Amino acid sequence: MSDRIRIADTKPYDVPSSLEALHGPGLGGVLHLGHEIIWAPHSQTIHLATLDDATFAYTAIINEATAADQERLLNKDLLLEVWPALTLPWRVYELWEERFPELPRNELSHAFLQR
């Protein structure tokens, strides 16, 4: 076992106050993300045309945004739909699923993380 400290072990992650506080656009909407959330070369505008678009955007928002930004950008119903498809650090799963037990589990990610 290594005593190495990784950024994933120390990086702070924010979590919104409640899922009901999430007021972002649903599928078909548009998100405008700042560089502090996503480093896109040309535009931080993401059209939520498909669940894949939402998965891409939500992964960045959950990993990088403040709780206030998460509440403004995320949509509860869309989050519940894409949560099992998100690829997140294990600490993020722990933080979010502890606070929001109604989130569906991503069994594949949890099986991998428990190794």
Task: Name each model-derived stretch.
Residues 1-115:
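Long, compositionally biased intrinsically disordered regulatory segments in eukaryotic proteins
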